[in-house]
A protein has these predicted regions:
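C-terminal membrane-solvent junction of multi-pass transporters and transport-like membrane proteins
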Residues: 2-11, 137-138, 274-287, 300-334
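Residue-level recognition of pore/gate-forming positions within transmembrane alpha-helices
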Residues: 24, 53-57, 87, 120-124, ...
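Transmembrane helix-loop junctions in multi-pass membrane proteins
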Residues: 28-39, 44, 67, 90-105, ...
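Loop-to-transmembrane helix boundary motifs in multi-pass membrane proteins
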Residues: 75-83, 88, 117, 213, ...
């Protein structure tokens, strides 16, 4: 199956890239936080949050290939360290999501923990061995399943609610917070090592994969993610029964493992295969030990300041470009 998919991917990679881009951005929180936001904060804050999420990959795809020296800045050691530190937290968010969603089922959180660890170990091995292509293909398969499952779950859950839907407020008083969340989300994709690797992978074309207009893939990825969020909103109206909670847990697991694999691969990209392998094993092994200590508070801080990190990186890229340009002009005059 993978050999046929590999050949198809190499010949027409645009949709595969777009699905992988959407899958990487999703994370477990996109489903769980989306429902919590629409039910707790209201429709308008959810729509603003969804807009920020949809635009994030699109903005990256349009501007990252265009800004001179930006890739060089993000390849620098300080930026690699910053992005590398963020990757384990992203892995833990995915693993936490799997455990949390199974806690609402008869299977319980312990089963969720084992499932999360099993997927983490599986992807550590498969990505170490096969790299980029396997990550793109597994994202494609899992995300296709996500669309099928979320469509079916939404339709069934709304029908079985028999009109007894969750009452969502307009949330006009939360518009200010919604705008803030939207603006904080938009630059977030610039701190995803996997997205920069996709740019380089498309440019190098070392394994014969067809080179494409990569902006199209990122725009497609953003739109695909927005389409997924439309179903998240609809599911927030429904009341789930125990069977549907299990289906929901499977859905969130599929969403979470797509992001989990991309961030595990990002650790390999950032630190190299050998050191990356060790860090991936530590990330999975220390998950249950570190989470009770409150380490996710550090992630909350990093997420809130990432807009400043990205802004500083973009300014540094322009300064670097103009300094080099000035030096080159000076050398010509001499």
């Amino acid at each position: 199956m993978f050999s046929k998919l590999t050949n198809k991917f190499k010949a027409t990679p645009t949709l595969f890239y777009a699905m992988s881009i959407a899958a990487t951005w999703a994370n477990a929180g996109s489903f769980l936080n989306g429902i919590t936001m629409s039910q707790g904060s209201g429709i308008l804050p959810f729509l603003l949050w969804a807009l920020g999420n949809t635009l994030a990959c699109i903005v990256f795809g349009i501007f990252a290939p265009m800004i001179p020296k930006l890739r060089d800045v993000f390849r620098s050691k300080p930026m690699k360290i910053i992005m590398g530190i963020m990757c384990p937290f992203q892995c833990w968010i995915s693993m936490n999501g799997i455990q949390t969603v199974f806690a609402d089922t008869v299977l319980g959180p312990d089963v969720g923990k084992l499932i999360a660890l099993a997927f983490a170990v599986f992807f550590i091995i498969i990505l170490f061995k096969y790299g980029m292509i396997r990550n793109v293909l597994t994202d494609h398969i899992s995300w296709a399943a996500v669309y099928a499952l979320i469509f079916g779950l939404t339709v069934v859950a709304l029908c079985t609610s028999h009109g007894n839907y969750v009452n969502l407020s307009l949330g006009a008083d939360g518009v200010g917070l919604g705008i803030k969340n939207c603006l904080l989300l938009i630059p977030g994709a610039f701190l995803y090592p996997y997205y920069f690797e996709l740019l380089d992978y498309n440019d190098k074309n070392e394994d014969g994969t067809k080179k494409i207009r990569i902006r199209t893939a990122f725009i497609g990825g953003g739109l695909l993610f927005g389409f997924y969020l439309a179903f998240v909103f609809l599911t927030s109206l429904a009341v789930f029964n125990p069977v549907q909670n299990i289906i929901k847990a499977i859905l969130v697991t599929l969403v979470a493992v797509s992001s989990l694999s991309s961030f595990q691969y990002s650790i390999y990209i950032t630190f190299g295969r050998k050191l990356g392998l060790g860090l991936n094993i530590l990330t999975a092994g220390l998950w249950q030990l570190l989470i009770p200590l409150g380490v996710m508070g550090a992630w909350t801080l990093m997420a809130s300041i990432r807009v400043y990190i990205v802004a500083a990186a973009i300014i540094a890229a322009f300064v670097w470009h103009f300094v080099e340009k000035r030096r080159a002009r000076g050398a010509v005059l001499k």
